[in-house]
Design a protein with these regions (language model features):
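Periplasmic-binding protein-like
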Residues: 67, 144-151, 226, 230-268, ...
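Extended ligand-binding regions for polar small-molecule ligands
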Residues: 87-96, 155, 163, 168-169, ...
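Acidic, polar ligand-binding/catalytic clefts
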Residues: 100-164
Length: 291
């Protein structure tokens, strides 16, 4: 009887001890697993929605831009701070994508080559979409802008249309659609009385040529020509209204399909929430809005 009782007590204690050890081990396992199943803390950053976009893996969008084309992109006088419509729009897109935006000042005439060499992820530099450019790179349309003719105040040559430039000296930035326009004009309507087309690396140099009398007109995007006139203290004016309006496009390499999709989504978001219209208004470019 005593031996049986001792055995019974031993078995009972063994069962209790086994249960205690099982509970203890279970607690340890639960404590180790807790961090993987815990709900995220309010306000904690979430996984980036563009994590599968190769160009954005480092958390930045690298933008190539010729930052000498006010009010689209320019440096604040005496600083290295880039400003302008394209700058603000790129920043708004970056905010939607959850990435920082970094700008690289790049000469316009070589900017497509720089993109193809992967010096940046995209071009945002008042680039008009053309069939020729579209053969090299892809675009996302984001504004609609035409061309303007900038002349000396009072319009001493009486220029009213492109054809009135025949036989005159005209300054223009190299690599722009305006240079193409002038070359086409020389091959067509001005073939018998060709213009002397003087090209410059940047638009401000073309404008200075007009100011010192080396040219009678400058062709540039209409908002840029208008800004040049407004900043000239009455020395310059724009002839009439813009003509040949066409889309500006964000330029991308053709293989950047994921980035293009992400940017298209971000652009739609800033249109939907009013940011797009606000940025246009900030720079007096309401007429450039895409429908």
């Amino acid at each position: 009887m005593k031996r049986w009782l001792q055995r019974s007590l031993f078995l009972a204690l063994a069962v209790v001890l086994a249960g205690f050890l099982a509970v203890a081990c279970g607690d340890d396992d639960e404590e180790e697993a807790a961090p993987t199943s815990a709900a995220p803390t309010a306000g904690a950053p979430t996984a980036a929605p563009v994590a599968d976009v190769p160009e954005l893996e480092d958390g930045t969008l690298q933008v190539l831009s010729d930052i000498a084309y006010a009010p689209m992109e320019f440096y604040e006088a005496g600083t290295n701070e880039a400003k302008g419509f394209d700058i603000d729009l790129a920043d708004a897109l970056g905010e939607k994508l959850g990435v920082e935006v970094e700008f690289t000042n790049t000469g316009f005439d070589g900017i497509i080559g720089a993109l193809m060499a992967e010096d940046g992820d995209v071009i945002m530099s008042s680039m008009t979409v053309t069939p020729e450019r579209s053969e090299e790179i892809d675009f996302i349309d984001y504004a609609n802008v035409g061309t303007g003719i900038l002349v000396a105040s009072g319009n001493p040559e009486g220029i009213a249309a492109l054809e009135d430039l025949c036989g005159l000296t005209v300054a223009v930035q190299e690599g722009t659609i305006q240079q193409d326009m002038l070359e086409d004009l020389n091959a067509g309507a001005c073939a018998d009385n060709q213009m002397d087309v003087v090209t410059f690396d940047q638009n401000p140099l073309a404008v200075e040529e007009l100011r010192v009398g080396g040219a009678v007109a400058v062709l540039a995007d209409f908002p840029v020509a208008l800004n040049d006139a407004n900043e000239s203290e009455g020395e310059l004016e724009v002839v009439g209204e813009q003509f040949d309006a066409a889309p500006y496009g964000i330029g991308l390499r053709k293989e950047s399909t994921e980035l293009k999709s992400a940017l298209e989504g971000a652009l739609q978001e800033i249109k939907d929430d009013g940011t797009y219209d606000s940025v246009l208004k900030d720079w007096g470019l309401e007429s450039a809005a895409l429908e």
